[in-house]
A protein has these predicted regions:
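Domain-level signature for soluble enzymes in the chorismate/prephenate branch of the shikimate pathway
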Residues: 2-113
C-alpha cells in the first residue's frame, strides 16, 4: 500500500493590522486549506523565507533585495497613497539633543526609514 502525504505550503504572515486583509484571504479564503500559516513580525517573515523554514512570506519590500533567489508573486500588496504615520520619532528633548534612537527590531523597514 502506498502512503501519500500532502504537504501544505508554509507561509509566513505578518501579524500586524495593516496586513490583516492579506492574512484574512490566506487564512479564510478559497485556498485556506492549502497553507500552513506561521504568524510573525515583518523581520521574522523575512528571516524565515531567507532560511527556508517557510515556502512563501509576506515580507517588507526592503527585504526582497537581500533574500537570494526570491521572486515576487503578483497580486495584492500592503500600501498607501498617503502618509500612514507608522514611523514616529518621539522624544522628551529637542531633536538636536538626541544622541541615540531605540528601534523596533520587528520592522527593518521602519529602521531603514
Amino acid at each position: 500500500m502506498l502512503e501519500c502525504r500532502v504537504t501544505k505550503t508554509k507561509i509566513s504572515i505578518v501579524r500586524y493590522l495593516n496586513a490583516a486583509p492579506l492574512a484574512w484571504g490566506i487564512l479564510e479564503g478559497q485556498q485556506s486549506g492549502d497553507f500552513q500559516p506561521v504568524m510573525s513580525t515583518p523581520s521574522e517573515c523575512a528571516d524565515q523565507l531567507a532560511n527556508g523554514s517557510v515556502d512563501i512570506g509576506l515580507i517588507p519590500s526592503i527585504e526582497f533585495q537581500r533574500i537570494k533567489g526570491s521572486k515576487i508573486i503578483g497580486g495584492p500588496v500592503v500600501s498607501s497613497r498617503h502618509r500612514v504615520r507608522s514611523v514616529l520619532l518621539i522624544s522628551n528633548k529637542p531633536l538636536w539633543e538626541v544622541k541615540t534612537v531605540a528601534c523596533d527590531s520587528g520592522s527593518r523597514t521602519s529602521v531603514a526609514l
